[in-house]
């Protein structure tokens, strides 16, 4: 499969984005998958426009966006993107939408059509902490996951799409003693495992990975 992997530039005052640093280290081939990497801006709509332009220019079987989730200690494949922008902080062009639908004619939510449970388990099997997440937030990460679902629903019915959040890396938490981090090499290992779990048949595993609350 041809898979497009995207990651955001640094945002929120950070000098680095672990998602971007991690995809730079991914190999160009993971199992049977040919990997293409794309940096996108942490900017509402402009980020998804850049992906849309790439999809117009080149065919891909799947798109996986990677983003930073400072405060999480594990890798978290996301189950669903919701149709709302509600930004607690401005994006990198000082946009701060509050309670604004991402697409007026879009569904309330789009579920990733990747085998997210299989991917989560593959990360764990590689020795990296992971959990299936049911919320991608309401900032640009959720925005991108939702926009990928919208693109699949309206333009590219055969494309697979998803999102994985990654923690801070250690250098980002030197002055944040209450925040967890993960070594960049571990993030890369986990992402490789997740991507490697994707197959042509797209079958997921039947296992309870949900949450009580």
From Swiss-Prot:
It catalyses: Release of an N-terminal pyroglutamyl group from a polypeptide, the second amino acid generally not being Pro. The keyword Kinase does not apply. It is found in: Cytoplasm. SUPFAM superfamilies: Pyrrolidone carboxyl peptidase (pyroglutamate aminopeptidase). Disulfide bonds: none annotated. Keywords: Cytoplasm, Hydrolase, Protease, Thiol protease. CDD domains: Peptidase_C15. HAMAP family: Pyrrolid_peptidase. Homotetramer. This is Pyrrolidone-carboxylate peptidase. It comes from Staphylococcus carnosus (strain TM300). The lineage of its organism: Bacteria, Bacillati, Bacillota, Bacilli, Bacillales.
